[in-house]
């Protein structure tokens, strides 16, 4: 399954400056539809280290990151990916 991923500026150092990447996602466990987590794993295969900037050690989306799958906020890594989905990664900025 095809997944387009929009990369925010704060993560582009992991994608050689590319702002949009396309990855192919394999079917999920047991041959079911691939999940959002599977999509992030495919993204990490293409760009090692990127998943860790999005997902923490407990396999949770980091608090400063929001994921939007076809325009709707995605909070569950087990959520199935729709066909030809677009994932937008949004990172919060802070400072003073």
Where are these regions (language model features)?
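Ubiquitin-like/PB1-type beta-grasp interaction modules and other compact soluble beta-rich domains
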Residues: 1-95
């Amino acid at each position: 399954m095809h997944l387009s991923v929009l990369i925010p500026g704060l993560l582009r150092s992991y994608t050689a400056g590319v702002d949009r990447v396309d990855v192919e996602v394999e079917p999920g466990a047991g041959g079911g539809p691939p999940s959002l987590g599977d999509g992030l794993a495919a993204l990490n295969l293409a760009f090692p280290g990127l998943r860790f900037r999005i997902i923490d050690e407990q396999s949770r989306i980091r608090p400063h990151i929001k994921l939007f799958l076809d325009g709707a906020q995605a909070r569950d890594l087990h959520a199935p990916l729709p066909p030809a989905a677009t994932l937008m990664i949004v990172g919060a900025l802070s400072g003073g």
